[in-house]
Amino acid sequence: MRFDSNGYSADYVSAFEYSTNGLPIILAARDGALSEALDEHIERVLAEHNSDKVNIACHSLGTAVCGHYLNDQQRAAKVNAYVALDGAGGTGPDTTCPGEEGWRAPCLGIFVDPERTIGPNNVHLPDETHVQAATSAASFAAQFEFFTGEEPTTTDIVVEEGEVAISGRAVYFPANEGANGSTLRVWEIDSDTGERLANEPLDSFAIDATGEWGPVDLVTGAHYEFELQRPGRATHHFYRQPFLRASELVRFNTSAAGSEIETNTNSGPEHAALVISRDLEWYVDNGEQTDILEISTVSPLQGDQPAFNLITPEMGNGNIGIHVHDDVATPRETTGALLAYFHAQIFQTGADVFMPGDPDPDGYISIVSSPRGDTERKQQLNVPNWASSEHRISLTFNDFVQD
């Protein structure tokens, strides 16, 4: 959206998505197994825009995927410029852009570690983190200038007033395969309680193997629920902060039937289960910049639960997804103890929090984030207290605070 805010049409931005469902698949991606699929994606983009070359930005494992792609002369010839975001690179003065001599696309490395480089052009963001280095305003500014030769006019996301078109995919995580056979319904909600404002959804989309849904016209600044109905399974409810601009790249990650995510989530008719995510690592032990993430529940039937800050040093600073539910060991009690399975997953952790719930919600759950400990610029989402026996809840906070 920052590119679009600076006149770089959103139609020119596309995502190449692939599976990371298990170590063998990850290792295959690292070793070049996706070069043909990436080439097909690039060919589609070139044909769509009647162009000869693309710019590509690749993050983390994606830098290995793109590095293998660029090692082929014919494929490298389709790339105008390449940005490597905190992934493959080296140390010292002799690192080079991927590819063969005479066929290398110009490259830019953006790294957290000030010792890492890739070729002659590098930007170091030592005060940022691995995921943040792909999404931050500073990273965007470096990418934009490298691709266009000009500094961006703004690093803010410029708000579009009124209705904007929103679309994307509903996919099984981490396979990135479409949630085939499900239905996505879109509701406008009360920002104070998460309650739906109408008896019928604004729109509804049948999800096929592509996972694609939309577009739907939504009002910037308004709050919405995206309800993914999964036949024979718990309904998955997605909530996020209000949209600021049109987007074709909204993703809803759900779990496949019988997945380890599903089997390790303790569910029941009297408590809620949710996942909180943000494309910025949660700082759990970083002095005054430690994040605060408080959860409270209003439940007339079961009793209110006071605000509890689930951020603890034991979580570690490298996570972007936090699973939250009442654990088996201490039912109806909030201890904040780590949920062992989720804490063992890369970029994820989990905490024991009792949030009273009901299949027919009797109240709501408030989740309040103070990014980097800044209590003057809080972010808040309020959602119905759906019981986990029949429902799952996912919340996405912005990785930025913008006045």
Briefly describe each language-model feature range.
Residues C107, P120, I166, S182-L184:
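A broad, low-specificity signal marking well-ordered, structured residues that form hydrophobic/aromatic
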Residues F144, T148-V164:
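Beta-strand-rich domain onsets/edges
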Residues V164-Y172:
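Beta-strand-rich structural segments
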Residues A77-A133:
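The feature captures the conserved acid-bearing segment of alpha/beta-hydrolase catalytic domains
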Residues Q132-F144:
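Post-His helix in hydrolase/transferase enzymes
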Residues M1-A57, L61-A84, P152-T153, Y172-D403:
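N-terminal non-catalytic accessory region
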Residues H41, Q143-F147, V171:
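Generic structural signal for bulky hydrophobic/aromatic residues embedded
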